[in-house]
Amino acid sequence: MSSRRGGGGGGGRITDEEINELISKLQALLPESSRSRGASRSSASKLLKETCSYIKSLHREVDDLSDRLSELMSTMDNNSPQAEIIRSLLR
């Protein structure tokens, strides 16, 4: 069995240019406050750590919002127009 790296192409090794491009794309996904100036290969480790931290914070935020929504829904009449609107948004 062979292991695959990269996504698609010819099965060769990923180039430094491709790594730098992926780092730039990943950096662009982070909020402005988490971005480091001039991502280079030496900062790839830092960028990956920041990305992991950001993803964890997003998970916490989703959990918090889910809890808040559950609390809100438990206080509403299930047949109310507001409850129906919320249900339609969740579909």
From Swiss-Prot:
Disulfide bonds: none annotated. GO terms for biological process: regulation of DNA-templated transcription; regulation of growth. The keyword Transcription applies. One of its GO terms (molecular function) is protein dimerization activity. It comes from the Eukaryota. Keywords: Growth regulation, Transcription, Transcription regulation. Residues 3-58 form the bHLH domain. The keyword Repeat does not apply. Belongs to the bHLH protein family. Interacts with LO9-177. Atypical and probable non DNA-binding bHLH transcription factor that integrates multiple signaling pathways to regulate cell elongation and plant development. This is Transcription factor ILI3. The gene is ILI3.
